[in-house]
Amino acid sequence: MKAITPGDVIPYEEYDRQREAFRRKIIALKQRRRISLGSVITLVFENRDTLKFQIQEMLRAERILDPVKVQDELDVYNALLPKQNELSATLLIEITDEAKVKEKLDQFMGLDHGEKVAIVADGQEVFGEFEGGRSHETKISAVHFVRFRPTASMQRTFADLTRPVTIRVNHGGYHEEVSTPGSMREEWLADLKDGAEF
C-alpha cells in the first residue's frame, strides 16, 4: 500500500473545516472494517484511509505543524500499513468497568504470544502476528497491532461469499469465533490488491 506522505496531510487548521465530512466518511468505512469477537475484543482492519484519519486526528489534537514532527507521525502510522499479501488490524481489548481495567486486562496476558487470534477460511487458518513492545511479564496494553498473511487459496475463499470465513480468538477462558460479513471480505480483498503497490 502506498505510504502516506506529507503532501497527503491536510494542515490541521484546514482539516478542522473539513473534519465532519471526513469523519462521516471514515465512520462509514470503519463499519465495514470493524468486527467484535465477543464482548471484549474488537478488530479494526486498517488501510491507508483509516490510518490517514488517525494521523489527521493526532496532528489536530496535538496542533502539530513542524514538518519533522509531522514526518515522525507519518513514520509511525505508515509502519502499520498492510504490505503485500497482508492484512493489518488494530486489536482493542475494550473494558468498560473502570474499576476493573487492570484485573480484566491481566486476564489477557499472553494474548500477543503464540497462536491465539486467527482468520479461518475453508479449513485453513492464518494466525495473527502481533507487533512487539505492547506487553511484558506484568502488563499488557489494551491496544495491539496485528498482521495476518493469508495464503492465495484463502484469498480466493474470501472472494467466494458462499464459503465461510471466520475470525477466532482462543486465549485462556476467552473463546470466540465470528463469521466475517461479505462487506469486510470485500475490504480485505481491496487491501490485499492494494498491498501489492507498497
Specify the residue positions occupied by each region the protein language model found:
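Long, contiguous binding/interaction regions
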Residues: M1-S88, I95-F198
